[in-house]
Amino acid sequence: MQNVPIALPLSLISRALSGCCLVALAATGHAQSTVGDTPSSIVANDGRYIHWHEHIIDDPQIAGFALSGSDGLVMGDLDRDGRADIVSVHESDSEYDSAVPDPDFIPPPEGHVRIAFAGNTPQQWFNITLAEGTDAPAPEDVALGDFNGDGFLDVVVAAELSHLIYLENPGAGGQIRSAQWQRLILPMTRNQGSYIRVFAADLDADGIPEILAANKGAQRPSPADFRRSTPVSIFSVTGDPLRGSSWMETVLGNYSVPQNAEPVDIDSDGDLDIIAGSRGENRLILFRNPGDGSLNFQEEAIGVVGTQLAGFNLEYADLNNDGRLDIIGGAGSELVWLLQPERAGDAWIAAIIGSLAPDSVTGMELGDIDGDQDLDILVGSYSRGPRTGDGEVDVNDALGRLAWFANPGPVANSAPWPRHDISRRKRGMFDKFIARDMDADGDLDFIGTRGNSAPYDGVFWLEQFRAREPGPVFTPARNNDSEEMPLP
């Protein structure tokens, strides 16, 4: 393990000056303003302009090695000091595209699971490596839960090259940051396929969380992998979680490249249901909780009118205030909202929230960004160019964008939501965000991961900053980074 205490200073003056210069050039017709340098035009409910400042929590420079391919993250108080820590996973895929099959290339078993322990301020973090290499080859996602009942959160990681691994928090002994966490690869998952998402939730209300995960069959599915079906499963533990015999798998169903299985009380009846997504079938599946303390979930199709979703990243909220949870997800370049029908079994109607074209909609998070008491949506895209250098891409290519959609209120499901762009760099993949007021200043910030952009991959937090004057909308953490680009 590597212990790296850091303190990140705030430095904004040079960026603001360069942004002003670029805006001035654009106004005279000599240059087109980039997204990040564009003066903010969005006013929050308090009358101030919304700007965004980027801060680094973890990256290759902090880690001391080539950290890359940053994907999933979760937050929880691992050491019970009253501050939320961050667990993140890093796939180490800068030399290949894990979404493209290649039978002649075998990815090396590389990757890192990192913890950033929170300090006294949001600029102070203590970073360690929790797992790496064959323990966590190409880790894609992570979940937290107290599986052994000691009051401390344990960690479960989904490794896209292989398996699910359980890492047990050492707990009250005071060695959380320095001790080797005991671990177990769940035996029924070893060398059985590929796991890309993982969640932990108490599905049967017995006080012990279960693990939910979909086995998508292969990290880089080939046509043969799409033709076969692999399971969506619940993994439950009875006894010591470090013993393989304590774990049992309950298969909910088999599908073509299933890539997600999320716990959510979709019918608001007080117990957790499961929403799964299949990439091969390009559809969503609902498993209803029987509510009797068993894991005998009932499968139902989710019929959708107006679009198709494979369900890799999903969010849930009652956006139209009808008392029913809706589903929000990405469909290519579009952000889509599926309205839950009044009657179970009827079709879910799709409403288009907005588009990032030519960029994709990949990661997303809901929160009241502008302070008007409704839910807005932050989104991030997935750059498709080179991963270790900017390369010959232009404004019409799929680049790495951050943007947010402002909830228009009562007409939310009848018209596109206003889009407010934050940054658009040649390289950046933004898989996961968590909304949180990091600096306790009363407005919403976001923690996220960034991939596809070595050596700038890692974990960051995006500070919402409000000012009376409309300066550049985005202030990056680094002076040197992937090139900021205009819109098409």
Predicted feature locations:
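N-terminal secretory signal peptides that target proteins for export/translocation
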Residues: 1-12
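Beta-propeller-forming repeat regions
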Residues: 31-488
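Positively charged, low-complexity intrinsically disordered regions
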Residues: 3, 16, 31-33
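Bacterial N-terminal signal peptides
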Residues: 14-26
